[in-house]
Amino acid sequence: MYNFKDSVSITVVSGNGGSGCVSFLREKFNAKGGPDGGNGGSGGSVIFKVRENLRTLSFYKNGHVLCAKNGQPGMGFKRSGANGKDLILFVPPNTDIYNENDGTLLCRLENLNDEFVILKGGRGGLGNWNFKTSVRRAPRFAQPGESGNSLNVRLELFLVADIGLVGLPNAGKSSLLNRITSAKSRVANYPFTTKIPHLGILRYSYDDLIIADIPGIIKGASFGVGLGTKFLKHISKTKILALVIDISEANFLESYNILLNELKTYSYNLFYKKKIIIANKLDLDSSKKNFDCLIKALGKEKIVGISIYENKGIDELIKEFFVLAKTF
């Protein structure tokens, strides 16, 4: 399993400009050829760029200082110093970049090859030949290069999916994701099996949807209990919420209400997103009666009953996903 990281704070530093050169042309038959000091090279800039197939910020470590290269000093014969190499930092799609000092959103990088120059390198200094005049024929000074800049930034990754699977621990979200997509979300019979979000692609006919399995939500998650708000943010950008409920449990309605309350407490926008209720584990003895009670209690909601174990209701659920997605 890869190390999922969706937030990291780093320091970025652009390169210093190279100093201009103080030099005078000295040749065999031209002992006083005049100033010929070249310009310094520009410092490297710091650029964030979206790269395909990146899904995490785990290759960055909190507190790291990442620097672009400095420009090289100018040389004689009016030769300019080499420019410093830019520092290109690759990020996944849907990465927000904040000024860590004041919390300002600097940029939102959403699509492949989007890029943002966050710091420009310092300009190279002018060599002494630039300062020659009719009065000052032999300037013995040059311009220093400009210093680069530094900035503390925070990177925040948002997973974007068409449908987010939301439920209490052990509701069956991971098993459902694995069944309808090619994802390999971890499955086991204990709470919080899913500790990081997993994405899968659901294909039907010539269309596809991105499905996200979000770690289980428990009562108080919106205040940081359990895995807390760490992953609730990832469903804030999904189009549709699929509330997965273990219909075999006696407290299935309480589970449903806990989910709604946590969504509402965390964000009204989440609460009012389009939803579909998935009553899972219909193969168990108590489920049929509970499912009828659920239909009666929540008759106005869109409800689909499924059994992943017996593969019942899966095709109907897939069709409903695509019907709902087309309403956007």
Curated annotation (Swiss-Prot):
It comes from the Bacteria. Its main location: cytoplasm. GO terms for cellular component: cytoplasm. Disulfide bonds: none annotated. Keywords: Cytoplasm, GTP-binding, Hydrolase, Magnesium, Metal-binding, Nucleotide-binding. One of its GO terms (biological process) is ribosome biogenesis. One of its GO terms (molecular function) is GTP binding. GTP binds at residues 167-174, 192-196, 213-216, 280-283, 307-309. Pfam families: GTP1_OBG (PF01018), MMR_HSR1 (PF01926). Its EC number is 3.6.5.-. Mg(2+) binds at residues 174, 194. It is an enzyme of class 3 (hydrolase). Residues 2-160 form the Obg domain. It is found in: Cytoplasm. The keyword Ion transport does not apply. Residues 161-326 form the OBG-type G domain. SUPFAM superfamilies: Obg GTP-binding protein N-terminal domain, P-loop containing nucleoside triphosphate hydrolases. An essential GTPase which binds GTP, GDP and possibly (p)ppGpp with moderate affinity, with high nucleotide exchange rates and a fairly low GTP hydrolysis rate. Plays a role in control of the cell cycle, stress response, ribosome biogenesis and in those bacteria that undergo differentiation, in morphogenesis control. PANTHER family: DEVELOPMENTALLY REGULATED GTP-BINDING PROTEIN-RELATED (PTHR11702), MITOCHONDRIAL RIBOSOME-ASSOCIATED GTPASE 2 (PTHR11702:SF31). Monomer. This is GTPase Obg. It comes from Borreliella afzelii (strain PKo) (Borrelia afzelii).
